[in-house]
């Protein structure tokens, strides 16, 4: 009897440490299918299709800024129904985000002010002599609370 109990516990232990791909969250083609598929650019959105989708209701573009939850972002909802993942443009910033507009970092859940998304090399002279009022505002926000970025959620 004790041998069978040991076998049962051993089996349960092995099942608990194994990572499985369950039917509810397994991508088509298996766990590694998403990594193997080539990334595509996210759908265009906004007025005149000048922006790109960064989330289900986030549309950002150069010269456009970011639109959150507006009628222009409705097209971004379709992105969830496409079988392959997309990659929004811009360099990597924040935590799993991408630069969406000058000074703005967005991920699939929201956007935040991020100094690394401002064009330029970010040296000390840029802090002392900002190029525009937008740069000045971004620098003041960054200096006032560098530990907690200002996050705009939907």
UniProtKB/Swiss-Prot annotation:
GO cellular component terms, semicolon-separated: extracellular space; secretory granule
Region forming the signal peptide: 1-20
UniProt-listed PROSITE patterns: NEUROHYPOPHYS_HORM (PS00264)
Disulfide bonds: 21-26, 42-86, 45-59, 53-76, 60-66, 93-105, 99-117, 106-111
InterPro entries: Neurhyp_horm, Neurhyp_horm_dom_sf, Neurohypophysial_hormone_CS
GO molecular function: neurohypophyseal hormone activity
One of the Pfam families matching this protein, by short name: Hormone_5
Residues modified to Glycine amide: 29
Function according to Swiss-Prot or TrEMBL: Isotocin causes contraction of smooth muscles.
Family to which the UniProt record says this protein belongs: Belongs to the vasopressin/oxytocin family.
Name assigned to this protein: Isotocin-neurophysin IT 1
Organism of origin: Catostomus commersonii (White sucker)
């Amino acid at each position: 009897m004790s041998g069978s109990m040991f076998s049962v516990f051993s089996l349960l232990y092995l099942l608990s440490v194994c990572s499985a791909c369950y039917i509810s969250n397994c991508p088509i083609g298996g766990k590694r299918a998403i990594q193997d598929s080539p990334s595509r650019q996210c759908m265009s959105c906004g007025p005149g299709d000048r922006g790109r989708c960064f989330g289900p209701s986030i549309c950002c573009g150069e010269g456009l800024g970011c639109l959150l939850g507006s009628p222009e972002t409705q097209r971004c909802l379709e992105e969830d129904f496409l079988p392959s993942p997309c990659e929004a443009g811009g360099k990597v910033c924040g935590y799993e985000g991408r630069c969406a507009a000058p000074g703005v970092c967005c991920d699939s859940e929201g956007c935040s002010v991020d100094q690394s998304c401002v064009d330029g090399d970010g040296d000390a002279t840029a802090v002392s002599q900002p190029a525009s009022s937008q740069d000045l505002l971004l620098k003041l926000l960054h200096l006032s609370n560098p530990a907690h970025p200002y996050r705009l959620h939907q």
